[in-house]
């Protein structure tokens, strides 16, 4: 009589990431068609939306839904790191229960920046153990980073994204038109994540950012001029494509050496300690500046390349230094990162511009020395 069994299963994950203009234009059905397994004349949708986005686009969204005879419920969430909690997830779940969506053919729609996408994604992954959802990022950081992957999460205690899941959306709709109403600081915030990809993976993307930094800021990557449109489309294509190239073979992070973790070794601790002073991309930039100095000290990045990198950071209106970057924080962050990466540092660090390697032997003394050098280079900011 058998007393031991083994079950084995595989699941194929496919999701579409699509650039689309005018996602709230009633003539564009992409929002309702995304993730829908059944097309009906009377669709129903539960929509989680960022409070700031709702204030600007709420009327347009309602007109869109009315045009398509869609029954809907809006769940409006605050978009702040302080609100990125399980309480917000439960707010979404309460709304889902009240609205009573069909489990498979009425996908949840999440509209907002990375925070709201993470909250809604976590709720979708948990509700009835999995409910399809569609991501519609409205911030630049959402368009090139949070909106195109499969991670969900909320903060817990003093830890960023300590609770979360891997749960792919059925689709992500990228409409850069939303960037017209994003403030300047949040445009810079998103450009930090694009710069991340450039520094460790794509020298041509760095060249584009170096050549057109002011144009990218002035036109908000929305293509207001013919030249700006060409540049913005190429930047988006390289940033999103580069991100997906890294994510696709390792969606569940079975391999913990990840290029896309560049800038995310010390920044989670720095960002949470500095709340609300630093945005995510700003903390990532300080992290990248620190590791660029480390790379220079190890002979992996030339002084001239380090100067070019810092110049682009500053031209994108991003900080290269923060006064909280001291020995105690660095030691804590290194310990947390090593634990998160299963006992090895697996620290992505630039090699020149557009290349990278992983380090496992950083010491606190080396880090604090690099931080002191960074303070001297950027401490006036």
Curated annotation (Swiss-Prot):
Its EC number is 4.2.3.152. Disulfide bonds: none annotated. Transmembrane segments: none annotated. The keyword NAD applies. A divalent metal cation binds at residues 193, 264, 280. Its cofactor is NAD(+); Co(2+). Catalyzes the cyclization of D-sedoheptulose 7-phosphate to 2-epi-5-epi-valiolone. Involved in cetoniacytone A biosynthesis. Belongs to the sugar phosphate cyclases superfamily. EEVS family. This is 2-epi-5-epi-valiolone synthase. It comes from Actinomyces sp.
